[in-house]
Amino acid sequence: MQRRIMGIETEFGVTCTFHGHRRLSPDEVARYLFRRVVSWGRSSNVFLRNGARLYLDVGSHPEYATAECDSLVQLVTHDRAGEWVLEDLLVDAEQRLADEGIGGDIYLFKNNTDSAGNSYGCHENYLIVRAGEFSRISDVLLPFLVTRQLICGAGKVLQTPKAATYCLSQRAEHIWEGVSSATTRSRPIINTRDEPHADAEKYRRLHVIVGDSNMSETTTMLKVGTAALVLEMIESGVAFRDFSLDNPIRAIREVSHDVTGRRPVRLAGGRQASALDIQREYYTRAVEHLQTREPNAQIEQVVDLWGRQLDAVESQDFAKVDTEIDWVIKRKLFQRYQDRYDMELSHPKIAQLDLAYHDIKRGRGIFDLLQRKGLAARVTTDEEIAEAVDQPPQTTRARLRGEFISAAQEAGRDFTVDWVHLKLNDQAQRTVLCKDPFRAVDERVKRLIASM
């Protein structure tokens, strides 16, 4: 499948402080954030005009699920649009607090762990064909996903009883199973719950919940681009060396704790391989696969960065990728700070920087400041993100949903939508079922809109 439907769901950490002290509980902050949403949507679970879903997840975490996208840059742009949508709610909520005489600064963090050790996720969705063994896909994909943090981790300072250590991934410490149907209780790497949001006879949806939330646009593109490419290779019958892991959960932590990528992890049958070895295998197959697939500039950009990052890890010289990979950008920031102020990694100021890197408020968040200074590379523009806040992707089913929502809101009509249904809540209860996520034009939807 060279054209694939993809989406990213991001849960955001939330807090409210006043002069540095916590002001409101996460529950209370979430209520202020969603008050405007509830006022027009009559719910804290809504679909937006750009086709995305916005809702309050378990544990007061606002969650944004992008609309269905069919290209990497489109997905990165719509993922960034989610940050802007949430930032808009943040500004509105702060104003409400001020109006009520409460005051306080609200922070939304696009990260995966809070100071209390709770974890929240960034889930990737990939449409895959129903034909073929799911077990083969997960067998080949698992070693790739366990070691992928080497190329696209968000980076984190982990405080241990002995000392502070810099890790590749925020999420790795919180994953407890390889493949499972649960998402919150056991936190697997691949979630097998079969909700395709499409024609179930043709497709299934691969739900990957091991990834970090990325601030860097280039890292997000690398994360989803490499996974989509590995899926494409599996579907094409590409043969990979067997890197089945003896214990994926132990391996994911071992990989996260080793920025050199060289520490051996145990494979099934007692063999060993490093994260670098495993990633090199998938990368080498990808380079070969590019010779046989249709040319695609975005995929070629992904494979180029993949190779440069593996070279950087091998040589431990990150100069050629230090504006493109989250964990590298963040580590460089910390190292500069430590050198300038003669500071240990365990210093509270570093922990503060670690958090501020993920602050999504423009002009305040550290990643945003780095990006403005040209210290973080981009694949999209502010103009394209602004458009994605209001407009759905024009090449997928999201366009139908977005146009239906816009028309119903403008006509003052009561409606219900989900990923596959568009329904007018009138006497006739007219409903259109959109089972094909690749289809951006549908006469039935046009007629439904015209009838308003």
Curated annotation (Swiss-Prot):
Other remarks on this protein: The reaction mechanism probably proceeds via the activation of Pup by phosphorylation of its C-terminal glutamate, which is then subject to nucleophilic attack by the substrate lysine, resulting in an isopeptide bond and the release of phosphate as a good leaving group.
Keywords: ATP-binding, Ligase, Magnesium, Metal-binding, Nucleotide-binding, Ubl conjugation pathway, Virulence
Pfam families: Pup_ligase
Ligand binding (Mg(2+)): E9, Y55, E63
GO CC annotation terms, alphabetical: peptidoglycan-based cell wall; plasma membrane
Consequence of gene loss (knockout): Cells lacking this gene have no detectable pupylated proteins and substrate proteins accumulate. These cells also become hypersensitive to reactive nitrogen intermediates (RNI) and fail to grow in both wild-type and nitric oxide synthase 2 deficient macrophages. Moreover, they display increased resistance to hydrogen peroxide.
Binding site for ATP: R53, T66, W419
Full protein name: Pup--protein ligase
Effect of D57N: Abolishes pupylation
Record-stated family: Belongs to the Pup ligase/Pup deamidase family. Pup-conjugating enzyme subfamily.
Task of the protein: Catalyzes the covalent attachment of the prokaryotic ubiquitin-like protein modifier Pup to the proteasomal substrate proteins, thereby targeting them for proteasomal degradation. This tagging system is termed pupylation. The ligation reaction involves the side-chain carboxylate of the C-terminal glutamate of Pup and the side-chain amino group of a substrate lysine. PafA is required to confer resistance against the lethal effects of reactive nitrogen intermediates (RNI), antimicrobial molecules produced by activated macrophages and other cell types.
Pathway: Protein degradation; proteasomal Pup-dependent pathway; Protein modification; protein pupylation
GO molecular function per UniProt: acid-amino acid ligase activity; ATP binding; magnesium ion binding; ubiquitin-like protein transferase activity
Top-level EC class as recorded in UniProt: ligase
Taxonomic path: Bacteria, Bacillati, Actinomycetota, Actinomycetes, Mycobacteriales
PANTHER family from the UniProt entry: PUP DEAMIDASE/DEPUPYLASE, PUP--PROTEIN LIGASE
Keyword Transport among UniProt keywords: no
Annotated GO biological process: modification-dependent protein catabolic process; proteasomal protein catabolic process; protein pupylation; response to nitrosative stress; symbiont defense to host-produced reactive oxygen species
